[in-house]
Amino acid sequence: PLSNDELMHIGASLGADVPYCFDGSTQLAEGIGEILKPLSPMPNAYILLVKPPINVSTALIYEQIDNAPIEIRPDTDGMIDSLNNNDLYGVADRLCNVMENVTAKMYPIVGGIKTKMIINGAVNAVMSGSGPTVFGIFDDFEKAKKSADSFAYQFKDVFLTQVLN
């Protein structure tokens, strides 16, 4: 059998996000995502994911982001402090994605999903990766479920889950 470190090394050759899948706890990813450092657990929350029926070209997003102003930057230290304090609202406030504005300009549906999640009671909502999936963080199951139901009428790929630590 392979050790966890060996699996993570092999996984990194498959993709930058793969090593995370071997551990799964809350981690700080550095490098291209292959260097992982354990963090305090994520506070309890409900996560709603909605993927609109479009395909986003990651290559095109990266090409466009090179020419776009970066309006937001991650507050890594603030995020770590919020995790250490088990502060869901602090975590949610610090969620950001520097690619979101570029993708949302090209695919307005992304911004529409984000806005609707927040109207539906999400503490925050952010696009995942280069898109088009948007995830919302909810502090209450009923709000999360009602939001999921409201999206299920329009989209096939709607998933509601809970943070596991």
Question: Positions of the model-derived regions?
Answer:
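Conserved SAM-binding motif I beta-strand of class I
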Residues: 136
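Conserved, helical-rich catalytic subdomain that frames metal- and/or nucleotide-binding sites
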Residues: 23, 28-124, 139-142, 148-152, ...
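Conserved glycine-rich beta-strand-loop-beta hairpin in the small C-terminal domain of fold type I
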Residues: 132-133
